[in-house]
From Swiss-Prot:
GO molecular function annotations of the record: ATP binding; magnesium ion binding; succinate-CoA ligase (ADP-forming) activity
Protein species of origin: Schizosaccharomyces pombe (strain 972 / ATCC 24843) (Fission yeast)
Catalyzed reactions per annotation: succinate + ATP + CoA = succinyl-CoA + ADP + phosphate
The name this protein goes by in its record: Succinate--CoA ligase [ADP-forming] subunit beta, mitochondrial
A Pfam family assignment: Ligase_CoA
Functional pathway: Carbohydrate metabolism; tricarboxylic acid cycle; succinate from succinyl-CoA (ligase route): step 1/1
Amino acid sequence: MLTRSVLRKAPRAFSPFLQKRNLALHEYISHDILRKFGVDVPRGAPARSGEEAEKVARDLKVTDLVVKAQVLAGGRGKGQFDSGLRGGVRPVYDATEARMFAEQMIGHKLITRQTGPAGKICNVVYVCERKFIRKEYYFAILMDRENQCPMIVASDQGGVDIETVAAENPSAIIKRSLPNSPNLDPHIAEELVDKLGFSSSSKPKAVDAIVKLYKVFNDCDATQVEINPLAETTDHKVLCMDAKLNFDDNAEFRHSNIFVLRDISQEDPDEARAAKVGLNFIKLDGNIGCLVNGAGLAMATMDIIKLHGGEPANFLDVGGNANAEAIREAFSLITNDPKTTAIFVNIFGGIVRCDVIAKGLISVVSALNLNIPIICRLQGTNQGAAKEVINNSGLRIFSFDDLDEAAKKACRFSRVVEMAREADVNVSFELPL
């Protein structure tokens, strides 16, 4: 799977936040989309039970098959299920064997290096024919955000972890920025096919596949079309064996037929919950919860926390919806993470007045009865009235005007709470006189 370590070797402007917010689809759905654009893929169908997997295998009428767990994570082949089964991609040779492996996958969590120890639930398997491959290639189209155009990333070392290839043999990675156009110039595809080393018999098919994959990327508002491997078979056909398609969430209004296929079970439940109420929330690995309005201010808040030795627990942009209901939901999401040791509220009041935000904040904090420190910085319209409201509330909300000072205090409080938890003691905070 194309992830951050590969992108570091590509232009710098790939934002992890933008990547994470894009719609990702299961392999079997991606294959269906590719088929509609005339791209050749192996025959196959999804199954949601062992019985269905057996039927699909029989209907394919071949003895060389593969059963693939459908989870949105890389490293499936080397993963392990909580059922004890090793490997989320298993070759099988008859329908009975397909059923056996499907039953050990469906309803179980697959743990890979990308899912972490929690794993991801497998609700569907993809049963498809297995092809005899002469050569495997890697091919992807994604957005070059620095140059504001599509970019091809390709390699003649496909079928393996592209991150490993990029780390061990960076010269094997081909990158090319493309002009913004509804169609790919076939000459660009021909040049790439020559560099990758397709056989002369398969070159026309490879060019055709690449041109059509670009059409998928453009027409579907995709942010990434990744094929690994793009395979040349022993009979010189060119097939997209495994496909990962990501789509721009901002284009949902144009592609409701695609976005309706989103599998919420594969997404972080807190992030999915936040999206439903219009909050832009992304979990991170730190322990200082952040509640901010505006993506730019949210990024700056995380930067200054890290500058002072802290680690943000989340990215949370409430946007222009910083009312009591949004703040309540935001606090609920932040405190749902047991790692959180402090909460930094950093709001700039423009159209929404600071005193209104302060009243909403006080209402939420009073109801939640939190035992972790809250550091608050409200700047903008009616900021003086907001500070007065907070100071008169009697709640332990630490209010600051200066961003740097507020960030330092958040980091210090966080360390105090962390040390108290390690020592298994309670700690309380009082406002200075």
